[in-house]
Amino acid sequence: MSEIVVEGGRKLIGEVPISGSKNAALPILAAAVMIDEPVVLDNVPELKDVFTMLTILQRIGKKVSFRDNRVVVEPGNVLMGDVPYELVRMMRASFNVLGPLTMVCGWAKVGKPGGCNIGQRPVDFHIEGLKALGFLIKEEHGDVIAKKPSSFKEELYYKLPFPSVGATEQLMTVAALMSESKTIIENVAREPEIQDLQNFLNKAGAKIKGAGTDRIEIEGVEKLHGIEYHIIPDRIEAGTYLLAGVSTRGRVKVSNVIPEHLEALLKVLDELGVSITCDKNSIEVSVSGELKPIRVSTAPYPGFPTDLQPMLTAVLCTVPGESIIEEKVFENRFGYVDEMNRMSANIKVMNRVAHIVGVEKLSGAQIYAPDIRATAGMLIAALSAEGQTVIKNAAHIFRGYEKLKEKFTTIGAQIEVYPEE
C-alpha cells in the first residue's frame, strides 16, 4: 500500500508552476478517436489517468507517443470497437470514448467505468443523451453497446436532466461529426474544460458555439482534421496549492494559470480574510491576520468546485469559530471526515452539511485516504498539523497531481512518498 509521510507545521512559501488540466486532456484525447490525421497536444500532464487513456487509444488501433508533456495521436490499424474492461474500470473518463468510437466504427462496446467512490455518478446521462441523438444502446453483462444509426435527424434537441460534465463532453463530441444534423443541447455543464473541448474541436474543423453557457449548438461536419493544441492549466491543482499555502499561513504563488477559472475559490478566500494578488497568469495568496469562519456550498461551475471541498475543509479546521460547507454535487464527498477527525479536527456531518469548529492546531496521525481529492485534503491538513502524519492508501492522489512531491518540496514542505511494494 502506497503512503505519504508528512512532517507538518512548516509555512509554505514560494511559487508553483501549474500543470495542464487532466480533466481537459482526457475528453480531448477521446475526441481524437474521430480524427484520422495526426493530433498533437501540448501541456498534457504525465498522470496515471492520462496513461490509461493513451493505452485505450493504442488498444483500439491508434498510434500514440508521449514525451515532455506532448502527446501525438496518429492513425494506426483499423480501429476496433471493443474497449477492454480492465482499462475502463480504472477511471470514469474512459467512458467518453464510447460515442467517438461508435461514430468511427459504426459500433462500440465499453464497460461501465470505475474511478473514485465519491457518490452516484451514473453513466445514465451519457446513455440517455446518446439515445436522444439517435444511437441504439443496449446494456448487457456490465457493458454498454452502442450502434450508429443509418442516418441522423436534421434537427436534434436534448436537455440534460443534470449538467453532467462527462455527458456534455460526450454529446458535444459526437454531434460535431453528425454532418446531416444541427444539434442543440441544453442544461449543459459550463466548466472551462468544456470550453477547452469546444475550442479543440472547432480548431479541428467543427462548428460548435455556446460552451461556457447552459446551451450548446452544434452544426455537424463531414470530417475533422489534425491539429496542434495547447491544453489549459489545471484549476483544481492550482486551487490545491493555494489552499495549502493558506492552511500553513504561508505565502504561495501559482503560475501558468487562468485566474478567471478560479473566481469562485478567490471569492471564498477573500471572505476568509486571505490576501490575494492576481495578474494575467498567476495568483498569490498570503495570510497575515486571523482568518474568519465562512459558509460555502459546492455547485457546478461557476460555483465553488466540489473537487476543492476537502482541501477547503482542511483549511477551515484551524479557523476560529464554526464554518459550514454544504455538499450539493456528490453525496459521499465527506468520506474523509472521520480520518481528518483523527488529527484532532472537530467536524460533524449531517445531511451532506459539514459543521467545522476550528481548533488551535491539528495533530499528526495515521490516516487512510479514500479518493484523489480526499487525499489532497488530508495532505493539506497534514502540512499544517503538528508532528508527523502518515497517509495510507495514498496512490489515488497521483491520478490527479503531476510531480506532487517535487512541487510541494519546492515551497518548503517536508514530505516523503513511498510507492506500493
Swiss-Prot record:
It comes from the Bacteria. It is found in: Cytoplasm. InterPro entries: Enolpyruvate_Tfrase_dom, Enolpyruvate_Tfrase_sf, MurA_subfamily, RNA3'P_cycl/enolpyr_Trfase_a/b, UDP_GlcNAc_COvinyl_MurA. The gene is murA. Pathway: Cell wall biogenesis; peptidoglycan biosynthesis. NCBIfam families: murA, PRK09369.1. Keywords: Cell cycle, Cell division, Cell shape, Cell wall biogenesis/degradation, Cytoplasm, Peptidoglycan synthesis, Pyruvate, Transferase. Cell wall formation. Adds enolpyruvyl to UDP-N-acetylglucosamine. One of its GO terms (cellular component) is cytoplasm. Phosphoenolpyruvate binds at residues 22-23. UDP-N-acetyl-alpha-D-glucosamine binds at residues 92, 307, 329. Belongs to the EPSP synthase family. MurA subfamily. It catalyses: phosphoenolpyruvate + UDP-N-acetyl-alpha-D-glucosamine = UDP-N-acetyl-3-O-(1-carboxyvinyl)-alpha-D-glucosamine + phosphate. This is UDP-N-acetylglucosamine 1-carboxyvinyltransferase. CDD domains: UdpNAET. HAMAP family: MurA. The active site is at residue 116. The keyword Cell cycle applies. Its EC number is 2.5.1.7. The modification 2-(S-cysteinyl)pyruvic acid O-phosphothioketal is found at residue 116. Gene3D superfamilies: Enolpyruvate transferase domain.
